[in-house]
């Protein structure tokens, strides 16, 4: 019963559409009407500016981290936390607050894995930053980090649930970037201005 309650709590926290709500509250705009029309942190940064974009990023990361942190205080087993991590990421991507649509799951995945495997996640974050900085493609950085996640997890952790989550999220995030991949291959992907 307690685990079910945490699934519900995690979903509603993860489903908070940070970019949409912050955009409407502070700028009177819906970020889904501009740029890539995505509600995630990258498009929010482009549409709303650096300060609000960073705020969206932080909120999206916390949506993955906070539910797991709270649940861990109630003696849930590690595998339950892994499942809650998946719920948080799916909630962000399929938010009940915006017609079951949402971002691509990268920032919320960062929050989830920062809690579950902080050292590996920080290494992947460093790789993400380097790829994004030198190529100016956030999408390529996201795809690279997602691809490396299950590889790093396999060699550093023996938990089957965690490895399964890393594979699912890697495939999911890369799939969510399918239009970005097409634009990268055609040379039409938008570069990110830092």
Curated annotation (Swiss-Prot):
Record field: catalytic activity: an acyl phosphate + sn-glycerol 3-phosphate = a 1-acyl-sn-glycero-3-phosphate + phosphate
Localization terms from the record: Cell inner membrane
The enzyme's E.C. designation: 2.3.1.275
Pathway where it operates: Lipid metabolism; phospholipid metabolism
TM spans (from-to): 2-22, 52-72, 80-100, 112-132, 137-157, 161-181
Similarity comment: Belongs to the PlsY family.
Alphabetically ordered keywords of this record: Cell inner membrane, Cell membrane, Lipid biosynthesis, Lipid metabolism, Membrane, Phospholipid biosynthesis, Phospholipid metabolism, Transferase, Transmembrane, Transmembrane helix
Membrane topology: Multi-pass membrane protein
One Gene Ontology CC term in the entry: plasma membrane
Name recorded for this polypeptide: Glycerol-3-phosphate acyltransferase
Species annotation: Fusobacterium nucleatum subsp. nucleatum (strain ATCC 25586 / DSM 15643 / BCRC 10681 / CIP 101130 / JCM 8532 / KCTC 2640 / LMG 13131 / VPI 4355)
Single GO MF annotation: acyl-phosphate glycerol-3-phosphate acyltransferase activity
Assembly, per entry: Probably interacts with PlsX.
PANTHER family: GLYCEROL-3-PHOSPHATE ACYLTRANSFERASE-RELATED, INNER MEMBRANE PROTEIN YGIH
NCBIfam families assigned: glycerol-3-phosphate 1-O-acyltransferase PlsY
GO BP, sorted A to Z: phospholipid biosynthetic process
Biological role stated in the UniProt entry: Catalyzes the transfer of an acyl group from acyl-phosphate (acyl-PO(4)) to glycerol-3-phosphate (G3P) to form lysophosphatidic acid (LPA). This enzyme utilizes acyl-phosphate as fatty acyl donor, but not acyl-CoA or acyl-ACP.
């Amino acid at each position: 019963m307690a685990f079910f309650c945490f699934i519900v709590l995690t979903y509603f926290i993860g489903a908070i559409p940070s970019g949409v709500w912050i955009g409407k509250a502070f700028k009177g705009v819906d970020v889904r009407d501009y740029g890539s029309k995505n509600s995630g942190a990258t498009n929010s940064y482009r549409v709303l500016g650096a300060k609000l974009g960073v705020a969206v990023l932080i909120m999206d990361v916390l949506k993955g981290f906070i539910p797991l942190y709270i649940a861990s205080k109630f003696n849930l087993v590690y595998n339950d936390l892994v499942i809650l991590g998946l719920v948080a990421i799916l909630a962000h991507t399929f938010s009940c607050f915006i017609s079951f649509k949402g971002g691509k799951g990268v920032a919320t995945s960062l929050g989830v894995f920062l809690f579950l495997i902080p050292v590996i996640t920080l290494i992947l974050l460093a790789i993400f930053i380097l790829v994004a900085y030198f190529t100016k493609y956030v999408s390529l950085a996201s795809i690279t980090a997602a691809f490396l996640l299950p590889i790093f997890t396999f060699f550093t952790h023996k938990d089957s649930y965690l490895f399964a989550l890393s594979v699912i999220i890697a495939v999911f995030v890369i799939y969510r970037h399918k239009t970005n991949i097409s634009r990268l291959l055609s040379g039409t992907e938008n570069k990110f201005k830092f």
